[in-house]
Amino acid sequence: MTPASRPDWCLILLFLAVLRGESRYIQMREAAEDALFLLNSDFKRELSEGQIYRRSLRCIDMLSIEGQFTFQADRPQLHCALFLIGEPEEFIIIEYNFVNIDCIGGDILKVFDGWIIKGEKFPSSLDHPLSTMERYTDICEDGDVGSITRSSQNVAMIFFRVQQPGHGFTLTIRKIPNLFPCNVISQSMNGRFTMITPHQHRNCSFSIIYPVVIKIFDLTLGHFNELQLKKPPPKGCGDAGDFVELLGGAGLDPSKMFPLADLCHSFHGSAQMKIGCDNTVVRMVSSGNFINRVTFEYNQLDRQLEKKQGNSVEEACFPSD
């Protein structure tokens, strides 16, 4: 990871730490302008049935709960971003209740279907049905007050620039069920997930933004049987139309990550791998000819213990000492 992109990545990790509920209140300097975030699960449960949660937005912010959110500039804000994340089985709905920005004067309010940081996208261009430009919704050009945008996965992002103090906007964020989640960023460093593609020709990536131990318990691809590590020269699964691969890297975009293992054969049992990368991705490629299914469990990896244990692949992301 480049030094320029490291602060952005650390900010994402800090946001996700808050969402996990490690701290009920956390104060972020500079980037979040000393914002206090109340985003953990205990706070969600405190909201009574039917009550709408409301709060102000900061220039750099992140949301994991439903509610109505307002940004009002107290000074020119030129480079702002709002990260939205839901549970793996959720789509995000964004409704524009009130918009008071100067589009002609250079203000911006754009929604991106996914996350994008320093040009790296999730889902990657290989895993999303739309082109990069089609994934943007420009409220200044395409949207009206009352219009609605829906994400294609459990994450979305809003970019905005508001130059005039007192100007801003109000959004309502809702979640709706996604019966067959495809591309996912996990809020947690620990969990279990089953990815299913029912006769659909698409690629799906599950991203875990932590070093983790991955355990794959079950894989059904409609053919064969084996797990093979990618060691040069790899045989790989390139000729298979249906396979699962494990990726690791230091950025957001799965297409720019290291291929660590191919799984192109069905198996039932348990296969484990330790991945010492900042970001770990389980990616399923499906031809649409089968009902493909993979179940896996992930837990945060202790970097002090990862060397010389099992099938550690730490060297794929961190040079050896």
UniProtKB/Swiss-Prot annotation:
Molecular function as annotated in GO: corticotropin-releasing hormone binding
Keyword Signal set for record: yes
List of glycosylated residues: N203
The organism's place on the tree of life at top rank: Eukaryota
Signal peptide positions (record): 1-21
Alphabetic keyword roster: Disulfide bond, Glycoprotein, Secreted, Signal
Cystine residue pairs: C59-C80, C103-C140, C182-C204, C237-C264, C277-C317
Pfam families registered for this protein in UniProt: CRF-BP_C, CRF-BP_N
Entry GO CC: extracellular space
Annotated InterPro entries: CRF-bd (IPR008435), CRF-BP_C (IPR056178), CRF-BP_N (IPR056177), Sperma_CUB_dom_sf (IPR035914)
Family (UniProt): Belongs to the CRF-binding protein family.
The protein's role, per its UniProt record: Binds CRF and inactivates it. May prevent inappropriate pituitary-adrenal stimulation in pregnancy.
Protein name according to UniProt: Corticotropin-releasing factor-binding protein
